[in-house]
Swiss-Prot record:
ATP binds at residues 144-151, 828-835. Keywords: ATP-binding, Membrane, Nucleotide-binding, Repeat, Transmembrane, Transmembrane helix, Transport. One of its GO terms (cellular component) is membrane. Residues 1-14 have a biased composition (Basic and acidic residues). Gene3D superfamilies: P-loop containing nucleotide triphosphate hydrolases (3.40.50.300). PANTHER family: ATP-BINDING CASSETTE TRANSPORTER. Residues 15-50 have a biased composition (Low complexity). Residues 473-698, 1121-1388 form the ABC transmembrane type-2 domain. Pfam families: ABC2_membrane, ABC_tran. It is found in: Membrane. This is ABC transporter G family member 3.
C-alpha cells in the first residue's frame, strides 16, 4: 500500500484534516438548521457510501510516533472497494434485478367464532391493506412500533409464512412467488442468532456456503466467498473461535449477530435482501459499516432491500432511499422517499420535536400524533404574516383539538403520495419479464438452484461428525459406561450354570441389559432441542431438504449405537457365560443395538411433537416405562388381560426380549438344585408316606429345558423366530423414524410469544408526590490500585521437544489507577484484559495469582467483605424466568438488605429502581427464559442492573452492559447507568466500541492493550482530554469521528516502529499525575468512612429462606403445564398398572405380582426423577450468579429447594400409589394402616430418587452427562435392589452394593407390609403334579401357600423386625443425598473465572 499516491496523500493529511474540520462544522450547522438537508450534507461526508470516489472510500489515520518524528506511517482501510469488485465480476451486464409490487396485501390468522357472529371476526388481521414497491438498487427502511408487524411483513416477502393467509396482490417481477427459487434468491436475516455452539465461525460459514452456493460451484469459489464475508463483516480474527453458548465460552453477542448476517450473505444471487433488526448487538459504527456494505450490494448486484431497524442513527437512516412506517394493527402510515417524509408529515400538521432524532419521530408518531403537532410553527407563521392557506397546509385539515384522534392510516391512503405509488405499480417493470432474468453469472443451463440429496447429505453428515468430534467427552462417557456396566452386570451374573435360578437370571440379565441401552440414549432429547431452532432457520432458508437432514441424524446414531452395543456385549456376554456361539453373540449385539435405536426413535418422536425440552423430558420416561412393562418380563404375556394385550403387541421391547431370550435359552438343558426341586428338601411332608398325606420322598424338577422357561413367559421356543423378531424390530425402528421425519417436516412450534402479565392485588397506599423523586443520596467509593499484576497457569506446546509444558500467562502487567464516584470505562480490544481487571478489582477471580495493592476508601480489599457494599452485573443476563420484573428486584432486596431497612423503605427503593431504569410499566411482566419468549434483551439487561441496585451498593461493576443491544437500546441502558452514577455511586464498566453519545457519558477512562495501560485519566468535555493525549503522540483524529472508535483503533493497531502507546502513556503528564496522587494518598477525601460490615450476609437467614421458598414456589405454580404433566405422568401409568393387575387374587400369580408391583412403582419414581435434571442444571446458573454476589448461603438454597419440591414429590407419589393401590386390591390392613404406611414408604422412596437426581445435576457439568449418569444410578438401584437378583443369589463380591442402595430398603419394607402372614392358594392349573414312585398315584403341590414363602425366596424373611427401622434408613438416605448436593453446590462451580 505504500505507493507514491499514498505517501503524497499522507503528506497532505494535516491540511485535509483542517479542511474536513471546517466542512464537517458547516455540515453540522446545516443539519441543525434544516432536517431536510440531511441527504445533501451527508453526500459531502467522506464516509458516504454513495460516493464511489476512491478517496472517499478510504479512512486514513496515522500510527503513533513521537511528535517530533519527521516521518509518519499510515494504515489505509478500503471500505467497500473489494466487495464492489467482487460483485461486478459476477453480475451480468443485462441483469434486471427483482421488482416487487405489493398491492393492498393483508395477512390474517383464521380463528374460530361463535354462531351468529360476523365472518369478519373469524380473521385476526396482523397486516392490513399495505401497498408499496421495491426496486433494484434501492433500500427501504422499515420502521414501526413494537408489534406493528415489521417482522411479519419481512416474512411475507421472504415466503416464510406460518399458519396465516395472505389477501391482496404480491408479485415478484410480475409473477407470483416461485417456491423453488424464491429462498435461493432471497437473503433473509432473522432477529434470532441461532448457531451450533461448538462449531467455529469459519466452519459455520463454510457449511452455509456449501448449502447456499450449491454443488455446481467449485470449492475454491466457496472458500473465496467465505473469506470475503469474514473480511467484510470484521470476523476474520475470530474465524477459528467457536460460536459458544452459556456452557461454552465463544464469541461475543455482537459477533454472533454478524455471523447470522454472514450466513445469509454466502448466497450466490442476492436479488432480494430482507433484514430484521440486523443492528441488534452492534455498536453504531459497526451497524453503519454493515448497512453500508448492504448498500453497495444493492447498487452493484441490483438487489431490492428492506431492513427493519429500531431507532437508527441519522447517518444510518441516510443510507436508505425509501421509508416504510407501520402503525398499530399492521397499518401503513407512510411509504415514500426519505426526502419526502418530513414534507408529507408537515403537510398533515406533524413534525419532529426540536433536536429530536428523525428515527425516534418515525418510531413514535403513530402512537402520539398530538405530541408532534406543529402549533409553534403555526403561531410563528401568523406573526410573520402567514396566510390561512399555509396554516391549512400544515394542519392538513385536522382539527387542532383532535389531533390525537387523527387517522394517520386514512390520511396516507388518501394522500397524493400513496396514489402515485399505486399508479407506479402498473409501470414498474415490463409485463413479459421472466423471473430468471435476475440471475447471477455462472449458472449452468437447467440449474434450478437445488443441490442433489447426496450432496446435501454429505455435508450434513460432515457437520454432524465435526460436532461429535468436539463432543468426544460425552461419547467417551457413554462408551466407558458401556464397558463398565458390561463388566458389572457380567460379574453379577458371572458364569451362570444351568439351575432353575440360572435360567431365570438369564431373563433378568437380558431385560436389564435392554433397560440399560434405553437410558443411555435419553440425552438425544437435549440434542434435538439444541438443534431445532437452527434447523427451523435453515429449513426456512432452503439450505437443504428435510429428508437429508433427517437422514443425517439417523445415520450418525447407528455407529454410536453399534459401538456401544459391541463394547457392552463383549464384556457382559462372555463374563456371564452365555452360549459360546458366534451367531448367538451377533444376535445379542444386534438386540442391544436395536434397543438403542428404538429408544432413539421414541425420544426423537416425542421431542418432535412437543414444544419444549422440559415437556419431552417428562413424557419420554412414561412412554418407555409402559413399553418396558408390556415387554413380557415384568408380567408374562400369558397373564396380560385382554384389554391390554394390544399394547403388548405394540411394544417393540417385547420383540427385543423375545429375540434375545430365545437366542440364549433355546436348546439348553436345565436341572434343579436340591432346594429347587418340588417339593423342596426342607418341606415337612416330603418324606411322609402317601397314605399319611406325604410325598414319600418324591420330587420333580419343574422345568428341564430352555423351551419350558420360554413358554412360561410366552416367548418363542424356536431358533428361527429370532430372525423374524429382528425384521419386526427393524420395522418398528423405521416406523418411529418415519414418524420423526413427519414431525421434522410438518410440525413447527411458533417460538414468539408475548411475555406474560401477572395480575397482582395492589395494596392501597397514600401516595406522596415527593416519593417519586430519588431521595437516596449514596456516598460512592474511592478505589485505588497500584502495581497490579495477575498471572494464570497454562499449558503450551514446546516446538523443540513436541511436549506440553506448564507456563504462566501474565494477563495484567503493572496496572495503576484509581476510580472515584462517577462513571469509569474500562476499554480495550478483545483480549486486552478489561473483564480480567474488573474481576480482579471485584474479588471475583478463583484461579491464578494476584499481586499488588487494591484499596477501597483506603482499606485493603482483601480484608473486606466486598459483596456487602458492591454490585456486579455480569455480561450474561442470568435471570429467574418465572418471576416478574418487580419480583426479581424485590427478591434481591429481601435477600441483601439488612433488617434495619423497614418494609416501606424497601418498597420505595424498589419503586425508585424501577423508575430510574424505566421498568415501571412492565414491572408485573414475567421475565421469560430468553428474549424470544420473554422481555427484550435491553430490558433483561436493565433487570440485571436493578437486581444489583436492590442491594443498595456504593460501588457497581458492569461487565459489557451494552453487549447484544442495538445502539438505541444500549443508549437507554447507559442513560439509566448514568442516573445511577449521578445518585452518588461509583460505577465501573467494561465496554466495547460504544457510540459517541455513550462514550461521552463516562468521566474516567482506563484503556488497556494486552494487559498494559495505554491511557488512564479523565475523558474531558466532549472527550477532549483523551483525544488531546493521543493526537499529541502523533495520531490523527478526524473531527466528528467517534472518539471511542479512534482510541480502540490505536489499541488494535499498535505502531510497527517507534514508541509504543503504553510507553508513551508512562512518559505523559497523565501517568505522572496519577502516580503522584496514588503515592500521596490524596485521592480519598477526608471524612470518607471505610465500609464496615459484620458477617458475610446482610439479611437474616429467615428472610433469605422466606424469599427463596417464595421464588421456588412461584417457579412451580407458574408452570401449570408442567404440574399437569407431573400428575398425568404418574396417574396414567397408575391406571395402566392398576388395570393390568386388576383386583389381584391370592393365587400363585397374585403372590408373585405383588412384589413386581412394588418394583414397578420404584421404576416410575426413578424415571420421574430424571425429568427434573434439565431444570436443576438451568437453575444452577442462577445460583452461581447469586452466590457470587453474596445473596444467600448454599445451605438455604438447598433447604428452600427441598421445601418447594416436597409438594411436587407428594403429587408424584400420591397420584401413582393411591389409584394403583385400590385398583390392584392390595391389602388395606386394620383401619387402613397398611395403605397409609405403604404410601409413606413410597413417598420416602420418591424423595430419595429426587434427591439423588438433584445430586447428579448439581455435580456434573452438562445436562446430557447428568442424565446419562442418572440413568446409570437408576440401573444400579434396580440391579442391586433385590428384585432382579434375590439377595441369596448375589455374588459375595457384590453383596455390599445390595446394602448400599436405598431401593433395597424400600422394596423390603413394602414387600413385608404386603406379604407377611398373607395366605395364598393355587388354582387348578397352578398346582405342581408330583408322581408317587411305584404307584399310579399323583399328588398336587402348591408352591406358595403363604406370603412368607415369597419373602423367603427373595431373602427378606429375616427383615421382619426392620420394617419400621427402614423408614429411618430411607429418611437418612434422603438427608445424605441432600447434604451431598449441598457440598456439590458449595464447592463445585462449573462456571470458572
Amino acid at each position: 500500500m505504500e505507493d507514491k499516491n499514498n505517501i503524497e496523500l499522507q503528506e497532505k493529511a494535516p491540511d485535509n484534516y483542517n479542511n474536513n474540520n471546517n466542512n464537517n462544522n458547516n455540515n453540522n450547522n446545516n443539519n441543525n438548521n434544516n432536517n431536510n438537508n440531511n441527504n445533501n450534507n451527508n453526500n459531502n461526508n467522506n464516509n458516504d457510501i454513495n460516493n464511489n470516489d476512491d478517496d472517499n472510500n478510504k479512512i486514513i489515520y496515522q500510527n503513533p510516533t513521537p511528535a517530533s518524528s519527521s516521518h509518519i506511517d499510515s494504515i489505509e482501510i478500503d471500505i467497500n472497494y473489494d466487495l464492489s469488485n467482487h460483485i461486478k465480476q459476477r453480475v451480468t451486464q443485462n441483469k434486471t434485478g427483482m421488482f416487487v409490487s405489493a398491492n393492498n396485501i393483508s395477512y390474517y390468522i383464521p380463528k374460530s367464532i361463535k354462531k351468529g357472529e360476523s365472518e369478519e371476526l373469524s380473521k385476526l388481521y396482523l397486516l392490513n391493506n399495505i401497498s408499496f414497491t421495491m426496486k433494484p438498487g434501492r433500500m427501504i427502511l422499515l420502521m414501526g412500533i413494537p408489534g406493528a408487524g415489521k417482522s411479519l411483513l419481512l416474512k411475507v416477502l421472504g415466503n416464510r409464512l406460518g399458519k396465516g393467509k395472505i389477501e391482496g396482490e404480491l408479485k415478484f417481477n410480475n409473477h407470483e412467488v416461485d417456491e423453488t427459487t424464491h429462498q435461493r434468491d432471497t437473503i433473509f436475516v432473522s432477529q434470532d442468532d441461532r448457531h451450533i455452539a461448538l462449531l467455529t465461525v469459519r466452519e459455520t460459514l463454510e457449511f452455509s456456503a456449501k448449502c447456499n452456493m450449491g454443488e455446481n460451484v467449485s470449492q475454491e469459489e466457496q472458500s473465496e466467498r467465505v473469506d470475503l464475508v469474514l473480511d467484510q463483516l470484521g470476523l476474520s480474527h475470530t474465524s477459528n473461535t467457536i460460536i459458544g453458548n452459556q456452557f461454552f465460552r465463544g464469541i461475543s453477542g455482537g459477533q454472533k449477530r454478524r455471523v447470522t448476517i454472514a450466513n445469509e450473505f454466502t448466497k450466490r444471487s442476492p436479488n432480494l435482501i430482507l433484514m430484521d433488526e440486523p443492528s441488534t448487538g452492534l455498536d453504531s459504527a459497526t451497524s453503519y459499516n454493515v448497512i453500508s456494505k448492504v448498500k453497495t450490494i444493492a447498487k452493484e448486484a441490483k438487489a431490492s432491500v428492506m431492513v427493519s431497524l429500531l431507532q437508527p442513527s441519522v447517518e444510518l437512516t441516510n443510507l436508505f432511499d425509501d421509508i416504510l412506517i407501520l402503525g398499530e394493527g399492521g397499518n401503513l402510515i407512510y411509504f415514500g422517499e426519505l426526502n419526502n417524509l418530513l414534507p408529507y408529515f408537515s403537510s398533515i400538521g406533524l413534525a419532529p420535536l426540536p433536536n429530536q432524532p428523525l428515527a425516534e419521530f418515525m418510531q413514535e408518531v403513530s402512537v402520539e400524533p398530538s405530541k408532534y403537532m406543529i402549533t409553534d410553527k403555526i403561531e410563528l407563521s401568523s406573526k410573520d404574516g402567514g396566510d390561512d392557506e399555509s396554516k391549512s397546509l400544515l394542519l392538513g385539515g385536522a382539527d387542532s383539538g383532535n389531533v390525537e384522534k387523527m387517522d394517520l392510516v386514512k390520511l396516507f391512503k388518501e394522500s397524493e403520495l400513496n396514489q402515485k405509488t399505486i399508479q407506479s405499480m402498473q409501470q414498474l417493470i415490463p409485463s413479459d419479464i421472466k423471473v430468471s432474468d435476475h440471475l447471477i453469472k455462472k449458472l449452468e443451463t437447467g440449474d434450478n438452484g437445488k443441490s442433489s440429496v447426496r450432496y446435501e447429505l454429505k455435508h450434513l453428515l460432515a457437520r454432524h461428525i465435526k460436532v461429535m468430534k468436539i463432543m468426544k467427552m460425552q461419547y467417551a462417557v457413554r462408551f466407558f459406561q458401556a464397558i463398565f456396566m458390561g463388566c458389572v452386570i457380567g460379574s453379577l451374573f458371572v458364569k451362570m450354570g444351568f439351575t432353575q435360578a440360572d435360567a431365570r437370571n438369564r431373563f433378568g440379565l437380558v431385560y436389564f441389559a435392554m433397560v440399560l441401552h434405553i437410558w443411555t440414549t435419553i440425552g438425544s432429547v437435549e440434542e434435538f432441542f439444541t438443534l431445532r431452532g437452527i434447523f427451523d432457520d435453515q429449513k426456512d432458508s432452503k439450505y437443504y431438504r428435510n429428508f437429508p437432514y433427517f437422514l443425517s441424524l439417523v445415520i450418525t446414531k447407528i455407529p454410536i449405537s453399534l459401538i456401544e452395543a459391541i463394547l457392552f456385549s463383549s464384556c457382559c456376554y462372555w463374563i456371564a457365560g452365555f452360549q459360546a456361539r458366534v451367531d448367538n453373540f451377533i444376535v445379542f449385539i444386534l438386540g442391544m443395538a436395536l434397543t438403542n435405536l428404538i429408544a432413539q426413535g421414541i425420544f426423537q418422536v416425542t421431542s418432535a411433537f412437543t414444544s419444549a425440552q422440559l415437556l419431552a423430558s417428562l413424557i419420554c420416561p412414561a412412554i418407555v416405562v409402559l413399553f418396558m412393562i408390556m415387554s413380557g418380563y415384568m408380567i408374562s404375556r400369558l397373564q396380560i388381560p385382554g384389554w391390554w394385550i394390544w399394547l403388548n403387541a405394540l411394544s417393540p421391547l417385547r420383540y427385543v426380549i423375545d429375540m434375545v431370550s430365545s437366542n440364549e435359552l433355546y436348546g439348553l438343558e436345565f436341572h434343579c438344585s436340591p432346594m429347587e426341586k418340588i417339593p423342596p428338601s426342607n418341606y415337612p411332608l416330603l418324606n411322609v408316606s402317601y397314605a399319611d398325606g406325604g410325598y414319600q420322598g418324591n420330587q420333580i424338577c419343574q422345568y428341564s429345558t430352555g423351551s419350558d422357561f420360554l413358554n412360561q413367559f410366552g416367548f418363542s421356543d424356536n431358533s428361527y423366530m429370532r430372525w423374524v423378531d429382528i425384521v419386526i424390530i427393524l420395522g418398528f425402528v423405521c416406523t418411529f423414524f418415519f414418524i420423526f421425519f413427519l414431525g421434522v417436516k410438518y410440525i413447527r412450534f411458533e417460538n414468539k410469544k408475548p411475555p406474560r402479565q401477572i395480575k397482582l392485588k395492589k395494596k392501597k397506599e397514600k401516595k406522596d408526590k415527593k416519593d417519586k423523586e430519588v431521595k437516596h443520596k449514596w456516598n460512592g467509593c474511592y478505589m485505588t490500585f497500584q502495581n497490579l499484576n495477575y498471572v494464570v497457569p497454562s499449558v503450551k506446546d514446546n516446538k523443540e521437544t513436541g511436549k506440553k509444558e506448564k507456563v504462566t500467562l501474565e494477563l495484567l502487567k503493572d496496572v495503576n489507577g484509581f476510580i472515584v464516584p462517577g462513571m469509569c470505562a474500562l476499554m480495550g480490544p478483545s483480549g486486552a484484559g478489561k473483564s480480567t481487571l474488573m474481576d480482579v478489582l471485584a474479588k471475583r477471580k478463583n484461579v491464578g495469582t494476584i499481586t499488588g495493592d487494591i484499596r477501597i476508601n483506603g482499606q485493603l480489599v482483601k480484608d473486606m467483605n466486598i459483596t456487602r457494599f458492591t454490585g456486579y452485573v455480569e455480561q450474561q443476563d442470568i435471570l429467574s424466568a418465572n418471576l416478574t420484573v418487580r419480583e426479581a428486584i424485590e427478591f434481591s432486596a429481601n435477600c441483601r438488605l439488612p433488617s434495619s431497612y423497614l418494609q416501606k423503605d424497601r418498597v420505595k427503593l424498589i419503586d425508585e429502581i424501577l423508575s430510574v431504569l424505566s421498568l415501571t410499566k412492565m414491572q408485573n411482566t414475567t421475565i421469560g427464559p430468553n428474549p424470544t419468549l420473554g422481555i427484550s434483551l435491553a430490558n433483561r439487561k436493565k433487570v440485571s442492573i436493578g437486581i444489583e441496585l436492590a442491594s443498595d451498593p456504593h460501588l457497581i461493576f458492569l461487565d459489557e452492559p451494552t453487549s447484544g443491544l442495538d445502539s438505541s437500546a444500549a443508549l437507554k441502558v447507559m442513560n439509566c447507568v448514568k442516573k445511577i452514577a449521578e445518585s452518588g455511586r461509583t460505577v465501573v464498566c467494561t465496554i466495547h466500541q460504544p457510540s459517541q453519545e455513550i462514550f461521552e457519558k463516562f468521566d474516567q477512562l482506563l484503556l488497556l492493550d494486552k494487559g498494559k495501560v495505554i491511557y488512564f485519566g479523565d475523558t474531558g468535555d466532549n472527550s477532549s482530554t483523551v483525544i488531546q493525549h493521543f493526537t499529541s503522540a502523533g495520531y490523527q483524529y478526524e473531527h466528528g469521528r467517534n472518539p471511542a472508535d479512534f482510541i480502540l483503533e490505536i489499541a488494535e493497531h499498535p505502531p510497527s516502529t517507534g514508541q509504543s502507546a503504553s510507553d508513551y502513556f508512562k512518559s505523559s503528564i497523565h501517568y505522572s499525575n496519577s502516580i503522584q496522587r496514588l503515592e500521596s494518598k490524596t485521592i480519598v477525601p477526608e471524612g470518607v468512612d471505610v465500609p464496615k460490615y459484620k458477617g458475610k450476609y446482610s439479611a437474616p437467614a429467615t428472610a433469605q429462606l422466606h424469599s427463596l421458598v417464595k421464588r421456588g414456589w412461584l417457579n412451580h405454580v407458574r408452570r401449570p403445564q408442567t404440574i399437569l404433566l407431573r400428575f398425568l405422568r404418574s396417574f396414567i401409568p397408575a391406571i395402566v398398572i392398576g388395570t393390568l393387575f386388576l383386583r389381584l387374587d391370592n393365587d400363585q400369580t397374585g403372590a408373585r405380582n405383588r412384589i413386581a408391583l412394588v418394583f414397578l412403582g420404584f421404576l416410575f419414581g426413578g424415571m420421574a426423577s430424571i425429568g427434573k435434571v434439565p431444570t436443576i442444571v438451568e437453575d444452577r446458573s442462577v445460583y452461581y450468579r447469586e452466590s457470587s454476589a453474596g445473596t444467600y448461603p448454599a445451605h438455604l438454597y438447598i433447604l428452600a429447594s427441598v421445601i418447594t419440591d416436597l409438594p411436587m414429590m407428594v403429587l408424584t407419589a400420591f397420584s401413582y400409589w393411591i389409584p394403583m393401590f385400590f385398583l390392584t386390591g392390595l391389602t388395606l390392613g386394620d383401619h387402613g394402616w397398611k395403605f397409609f404406611f405403604s404410601l409413606s414408604v413410597y413417598l420416602l422412596v420418591i424423595m430419595c430418587y429426587d434427591s439423588l437426581a438433584t445430586l447428579f445435576a448439581l455435580t456434573l457439568p452438562t445436562i446430557p452427562i447428568a442424565i446419562l449418569v442418572s440413568g446409570v444410578g437408576l440401573n444400579f438401584l434396580g440391579l442391586f435392589g433385590g428384585f432382579f437378583i434375590p439377595v441369596n443369589n448375589i455374588p459375595r463380591g457384590w453383596i455390599w452394593m445390595h446394602y448400599l442402595v436405598f431401593s433395597k430398603y424400600g422394596l423390603e419394607t413394602l414387600s413385608i407390609t404386603e406379604l407377611k402372614g398373607e395366605p395364598f392358594f393355587c388354582e387348578e392349573d397352578q398346582y405342581s403334579i408330583i408322581p408317587i414312585a411305584g404307584t399310579n398315584f399323583t399328588k398336587k403341590y402348591c408352591a406358595i401357600q403363604s406370603g412368607d414363602t415369597m419373602l423367603l425366596q427373595y431373602g427378606m424373611n429375616d427383615a421382619y423386625d426392620r420394617q419400621f427401622y427402614n423408614l429411618i434408613i430411607l429418611g437418612g438416605y434422603f438427608c445424605a443425598y441432600t447434604f451431598l448436593g449441598y457440598l456439590a453446590l458449595r464447592f463445585i462451580n462449573h462456571m470458572k473465572r
